Amino acid sequence: MLLIPAIDLKDGRCVRLKQGDMNVSTTFGEDPVAMARRWLDAGARRLHLVDLNGAFAGKPVNEPAIKAILKEVGDEIPVQLGGGIRDLDTIERYLDDGLSYVIIGTAAVKNPGFLRDACTAFGGHIIVGLDAKDGKVATDGWSKLTGHEVVDLAKKFEDYGVEGVIYTDIGRDGMLSGINIDATVKLAQALTIPVIASGGLSDIADIERLCAVEGEGIEGVICGRAIYTGDLDFAAAQARADALNGDA
């Protein structure tokens, strides 16, 4: 079970939002590169970056900070990025800079042809990010709820050749209310590609619950607010996951 620290970038700083609200953010660091190094030193085996401004603007905004992070740690661990990625040129540029995985969310839902083209051009590097509330997919930085069922869309995108799915339960994100295990398992069981859980991770018990269902196809979990507030000790949590899964 991969525990993947999230570094959410807003105006060049590391922040956390509550339920995707750009007006309700807490700054946890002024130096994104130092934050990336901090998580690497704590034992992270992958990093999750989000260009928050980019997600709302529909184009890259925090690219300088992202490039600096890739320069610092991109040769050491895989880095994945979401937010504001709407065209193939942007994907190519980020991959050339050392990014391992591009996360396509809103653009995949609104323009499935773009996702298909991205999978064709950059096979092995495309992850789809599906954000859902009560099983329905949301787009545009979670501001718009669609009528799409998350399982149906994920199966369609699996056929396109995406590398995996990051599933975020919007109702829980940033609330430290616990991962929606049932919904995540339901999605993983419907797919053959890996699912990464996201939204609401609160404590070591969540990690233990996820490890218990890892065999259903859950590859990892995005760690956000809990590792910044101290509710979850990242290094201890990864060690616990490794011990439970026999990786230690």
UniProtKB/Swiss-Prot annotation:
Keywords: Amino-acid biosynthesis, Cytoplasm, Histidine biosynthesis, Isomerase. Pfam families: His_biosynth. The gene is hisA. It is found in: Cytoplasm. PANTHER family: 1-(5-PHOSPHORIBOSYL)-5-[(5-PHOSPHORIBOSYLAMINO)METHYLIDENEAMINO] IMIDAZOLE-4-CARBOXAMIDE ISOMERASE (PTHR43090:SF2). InterPro entries: Aldolase_TIM, His_biosynth, HisA_bact_arch, Isoase_HisA-like, Isoase_HisA-like_bact, RibuloseP-bd_barrel. Pathway: Amino-acid biosynthesis; L-histidine biosynthesis; L-histidine from 5-phospho-alpha-D-ribose 1-diphosphate: step 4/9. GO terms for biological process: L-histidine biosynthetic process; L-tryptophan biosynthetic process. Its EC number is 5.3.1.16. Belongs to the HisA/HisF family. It comes from the Bacteria. One of its GO terms (cellular component) is cytoplasm. This is 1-(5-phosphoribosyl)-5-[(5-phosphoribosylamino)methylideneamino] imidazole-4-carboxamide isomerase. One of its GO terms (molecular function) is 1-(5-phosphoribosyl)-5-[(5-phosphoribosylamino)methylideneamino]imidazole-4-carboxamide isomerase activity. The active site is at D8, D131. It catalyses: 1-(5-phospho-beta-D-ribosyl)-5-[(5-phospho-beta-D-ribosylamino)methylideneamino]imidazole-4-carboxamide = 5-[(5-phospho-1-deoxy-D-ribulos-1-ylimino)methylamino]-1-(5-phospho-beta-D-ribosyl)imidazole-4-carboxamide. NCBIfam families: 1-(5-phosphoribosyl)-5-[(5-phosphoribosylamino)methylideneamino]imidazole-4-carboxamide isomerase.
